[in-house]
Structure formats: C-alpha cells, structure tokens
Amino acid sequence: MSESRNQRKVYQGRVVSDKMDKTITVVVETYKNHKVYGKRVKYSKKFKAHDENNEAKVGDIVKIMETRPLSATKRFRLLEIVEKAVIL
C-alpha cells in the first residue's frame, strides 16, 4: 500500500485562505514553456486541501498530497508545513 501512496501527486504552494473550518486554499505556481516563443510563462492553480487541525495560516508554504474526494471541491490533504509565514 505504501508504494501506491507514493504515486500520489504532491504539490508545494502558498496558503491564500484559511477562513473555512478544516479547509485551506493553496495556490501552486509553476512554469511552462510557450510553444512558439520558448519563453517560460508562469501560471498558478488553486487547490482546496483538508487541514484536520487548522494549523496552516495565510502565507505559510505547505505541501499537499492528492487523496480521495473529501467533498465537492476538496481532493488534497495537508502533508506538512514547510515554512511558517512571518507576521509583521
């Protein structure tokens, strides 16, 4: 079972919302090469992730892992908090 678990997608991103109970919104930024011009183009995608203990806050860098559907929009769960946000 651990081999199949390692095949799940793992993304690293930044928490942009933690207003829902046990749910965070994570924006994952990545790059693609433009087909014609070859320039790297940055694009981002938002994912909702399950945060069981409400430990992630806005601005944190987190890792999320693909899991079974937990709700209509949640398909990921919080794996770990890589870096806490600096609160000024």
From Swiss-Prot:
SUPFAM superfamilies, alphabetized: Nucleic acid-binding proteins (SSF50249)
Top-level taxonomic group: Bacteria
InterPro entries tied to this protein: NA-bd_OB-fold, Ribosomal_uS17, Ribosomal_uS17_bact/chlr, Ribosomal_uS17_CS
Annotated PROSITE patterns: RIBOSOMAL_S17
Keywords from the UniProt entry: Ribonucleoprotein, Ribosomal protein, RNA-binding, rRNA-binding
GO terms classed as biological process: translation
Keyword Nucleus: no
Pfam families: Ribosomal_S17 (PF00366)
GO cellular component: cytosolic small ribosomal subunit
Record GO terms (molecular function): rRNA binding; structural constituent of ribosome
Keyword Ribosomal protein: yes
Quaternary structure and partners: Part of the 30S ribosomal subunit.
Function: One of the primary rRNA binding proteins, it binds specifically to the 5'-end of 16S ribosomal RNA.
Family affiliation: Belongs to the universal ribosomal protein uS17 family.
NCBIfam families in alphabetical order: PRK05610.1 (NF004123), uS17_bact (TIGR03635)
Protein name: Small ribosomal subunit protein uS17
Species this protein is from: Ligilactobacillus salivarius (strain UCC118)
